[in-house]
Amino acid sequence: MKTIKFLRLSLFAGCIALMASCSDPVKSRMGGYSYQIAKQEVTIDDTVSIVLTGEMGALQMERVKNDNILLTFNSLKGDVYTTTGRIDDDEIVLQPFERTLSVTYTVTQEDLLRPVDKTVNETYNIEVSGGAEMHDETIHFTLQYRGTGVSNDKQIVGEDILMVAKKN
């Protein structure tokens, strides 16, 4: 009788240990992250190449269903944008999303007497696409930007833009 109780208890403990070892890897990666865009080089109309100032903020990753997630980016500049994605092993495939991007750069124009520097402020509506690789406590995003000026018809393109998010 004691042997049967001991066997049942051992079997129950083994089942609990097995269920704990099969915990959901997606769930463990949900939550809050701090992000920073490290390299943000864009080209305007295939002529002007600009390295933008870095962007920092908070990223909230929530599970929607199964392996689908909702990502909310809250920039310290005040911008908030969201997208959905899908987790496939250690990779995130992002759905493209739209956001605005403000760009400031200086151009030199020839005047009658001397060159004159002119500061240009432009806003672009861009589509952001890409994916990410998940590591223990960090996520490395590789993003692409494509868009058009809000008040002009200039085109903006950015490739291999690196964003790193670290779990809080």
Predicted regions, residues:
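Tryptophan-anchored aromatic micro-motifs
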Residues: 27-51
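C-terminal motif of bacterial Sec signal peptides marking the signal peptidase cleavage site
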Residues: 18-21
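N-terminal glycine/threonine-rich, aromatic-flanked beta-hairpin/loop signature
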Residues: 46-91, 143-145
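Edge beta-strand at a domain terminus
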Residues: 89-91, 138-168
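Hydrophobic/aromatic beta-strand elements that line small-molecule binding cavities or substrate pockets
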Residues: 57-62, 82-87, 91, 122-134, ...
